[in-house]
UniProtKB/Swiss-Prot annotation:
Organism of this sequence: Thermosipho africanus (strain TCF52B)
Gene responsible for this protein: rimP
Name used for this protein in its record: Ribosome maturation factor RimP
Subcellular localization(s) per the UniProt record: Cytoplasm
Function, in words: Required for maturation of 30S ribosomal subunits.
InterPro entries given in the database record: Ribosome_maturation_RimP, RimP_C, RimP_C_sf, RimP_N, RimP_N_sf
C-alpha cells in the first residue's frame, strides 16, 4: 500500500505543478470492502476551484489507468483542504495572517486572529483584544475557523 501511495504522490505532485497547485494530502484506504483514494490539493495564491479539482482528477486518473498500479477498483476524489483547513507549517500561519484560527496546545484551546508571525512565534489576538504569543513548537493542532 505504501508503494501505491508513493507512486500516486509522484503523479499528483506532477499534475499539481502543471496547474500551479500544491499537493496537500493523499489518503488511500479500505472502508467496508471498498477502496478509496482521496487527494487534497491547495492553491497557495488563491482558492481551489472545482475546475482545479477536475483537472487534477483527470490527470491523475489518466496516469493511474496508463500505469495500472492500483490492482483493485477504487473511488477517486480530489478536493481542497476546506474552509476549516489544518495549519501544518509556520508558512501556513504566515499565509493566513488576519484569519481566525483554533489552536490546541497541551492544556488549552485558543481561538483568535493571527496578527503576526515572527521567527517561530505566532501572535494571536483573542476576543478581549489581548495579544497572546504562541511558540510554534507548542502547537498540537491548528485549524482555520469559519468567521461568520
Amino acid at each position: 500500500m505504501k508503494e501505491i501511495v508513493s507512486k500516486v504522490k509522484e503523479i499528483a505532485e506532477s499534475a499539481c505543478k502543471k496547474y500551479n497547485l500544491e499537493l496537500f494530502d493523499i489518503k488511500y484506504y479500505n472502508k467496508s470492502g471498498k477502496w478509496f483514494l482521496e487527494i487534497v490539493i491547495d492553491n497557495p495564491l488563491d482558492y481551489v476551484s472545482t475546475k482545479d479539482c477536475e483537472n487534477i482528477s483527470r490527470e491523475v486518473e489518466f496516469q493511474l489507468d496508463k500505469l495500472d498500479i492500483i490492482p483493485q477498483r477504487y473511488y477517486l476524489t480530489v478536493s481542497s483542504p476546506g474552509l476549516d483547513r489544518p495549519l501544518r507549517s509556520i508558512d501556513d500561519f504566515k499565509r493566513f495572517i488576519n484569519n481566525k484560527v483554533k489552536i490546541k496546545l497541551e492544556n488549552e484551546t485558543i481561538i483568535g486572529y493571527i496578527k503576526d508571525v515572527k521567527d517561530s512565534v505566532i501572535f494571536l489576538e483573542e476576543n478581549n483584544k489581548k495579544i497572546k504569543e504562541i511558540k510554534y513548537n507548542q502547537i498540537k493542532k491548528a485549524n482555520l475557523e469559519i468567521d461568520i
